[in-house]
């Protein structure tokens, strides 16, 4: 905790550089700003499982959420979006459990508590929207649908949910939880937005709940963003099938076919889940294309639906490394009401003079614009 306190103390001495065009010698610490003062943002946090599975890595996840909280006003952050796999194992009782004793040193309860502690940085400041990953259910990875998530993420813990959480779906036991939930936002330029976060591999009942919701009189004119754990592979293809024992379920292509493609107002899909360790050249420069994917397809009525995958859990080059170098994405919703500017940033690298020059990922796969259709 001393190290985390030191990190957070460093963050208070911020100076600003543009999120859209960092140039010249970086200031220390590096703080992004919106390219337009009328914009707002949402922060996309990729799978945190490799932060929380090791005791030594857990402060890095809390660094991410503390940074988001500290920049809430600077970046006009409306929500933090978590792509799932909040933990590595949902129900592991023994830290050194077989079959993989090297895959973390924390029990599941310790992992979920670390998640809760990190999210507490955002309580009362903004809603955090969490979709459920395959590691968040079952024993280790989606053997069945039991999840500890409802014990740690529930409406009463964060007062910011009161103004945004508008609907929940029954889980596999018929109990309403935040495993599948919808959140509403309003903006003068963007109008009405609805963000729907799904359980992992959503069941038919969950897809039908979402369909009825987005077609209802209350939300049929909202632009809908789907936050789901598994959707795109690293090559940008939609995943057609996965090897988990879970049943009943819908894999990503079925989710597209049954819900997204026929819809008139789903305008964006965000996901994590996939991604492989980047390759490093002789100078230590990483090729991060394996941690990101983007594609655009037309819905049945002809409007474009961008789909974006971002997962940096192995962004340091190792599945069992530091958890991902604290990479996150800043989604800047521009005041034209249709453009989202995406940039990729590490609060960890930003706070040290030795690494500040690495705080941004500026390749085409990590800095781009998305155009979002109106219903």
Indicate where each model-derived feature is located.
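Hydrophobic h-region of N-terminal signal peptides that target proteins for export
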Residues: 10-18
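N-terminal active-site segment of His-dependent metallophosphoesterases
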Residues: 20-106
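A short C-terminal boundary segment appended to hydrolase-like catalytic domains
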Residues: 36, 320-375
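Active-site neighborhood of phospho(di)ester-bond hydrolases with catalytic His/Asp-centered motifs
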Residues: 44-46, 78-85, 124-133, 198, ...
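Solvent-exposed loop/turn segments at secondary-structure junctions
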Residues: 48-51, 86-90, 134-139, 199-204, ...
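Extended active-site neighborhood of metal-dependent phosphoesterases/phosphodiesterases
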Residues: 92-208, 219, 262, 283-311, ...
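Active-site-proximal segments of metal-dependent phosphoesterases and phosphodiesterases across multiple
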Residues: 98-100, 104, 108, 205-208, ...
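Conserved beta-sheet core of the metallophosphoesterase superfamily
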Residues: 247-335
């Amino acid at each position: 905790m001393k190290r985390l306190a030191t990190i957070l103390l460093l963050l208070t001495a911020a100076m600003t550089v543009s999120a859209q065009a960092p140039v010249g010698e970086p200031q220390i610490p590096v703080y992004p700003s919106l390219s337009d003062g009328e914009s707002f943002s949402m922060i996309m946090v990729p799978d945190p499982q490799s932060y929380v599975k090791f005791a030594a890595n857990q402060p890095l996840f809390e660094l991410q959420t503390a940074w988001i909280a500290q920049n809430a006003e600077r970046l006009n952050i409306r929500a933090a979006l978590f792509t799932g796999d909040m933990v590595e194992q949902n129900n592991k009782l023994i830290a050194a459990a077989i079959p993989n004793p090297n895959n973390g040193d924390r029990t599941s309860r310790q992992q979920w508590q670390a998640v809760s502690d990190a999210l507490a940085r955002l309580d009362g400041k903004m809603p955090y929207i969490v979709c459920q990953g395959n590691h968040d259910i079952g024993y280790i990875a989606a053997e069945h649908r039991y999840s500890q998530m409802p014990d740690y993420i529930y409406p009463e813990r964060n007062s910011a949910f009161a103004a945004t959480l508008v609907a929940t779906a029954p889980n596999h036991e018929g109990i309403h939880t935040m495993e599948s939930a919808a959140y509403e936002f309003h903006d003068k330029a963007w109008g009405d937005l609805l963000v729907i976060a799904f359980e992992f591999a959503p069941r038919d009942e969950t897809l039908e709940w979402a369909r009825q919701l987005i077609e209802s009189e209350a939300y049929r004119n909202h632009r809908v963003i789907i936050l789901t754990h598994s959707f795109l592979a690293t090559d940008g293809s939609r995943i057609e099938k996965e090897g988990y024992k879970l049943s009943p379920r819908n894999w990503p292509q079925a989710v597209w076919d049954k819900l997204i493609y026929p819809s008139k107002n789903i305008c964006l899909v965000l996901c994590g889940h996939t991604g492989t360790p980047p390759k490093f050249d002789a100078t230590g420069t990483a090729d991060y294309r394996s941690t990101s994917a983007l594609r655009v397809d037309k819905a049945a009525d002809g409007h474009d639906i961008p789909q974006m995958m971002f997962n940096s859990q192995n962004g340091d080059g190792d599945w069992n490394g530091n958890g991902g170098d604290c990479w996150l994405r800043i989604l800047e919703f521009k005041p034209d009401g249709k453009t989202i500017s995406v940039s990729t940033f590490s609060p960890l690298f930003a706070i040290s003079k030795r690494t500040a020059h690495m705080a941004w990922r500026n390749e085409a796969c990590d800095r781009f614009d998305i155009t979002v259709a109106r219903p």
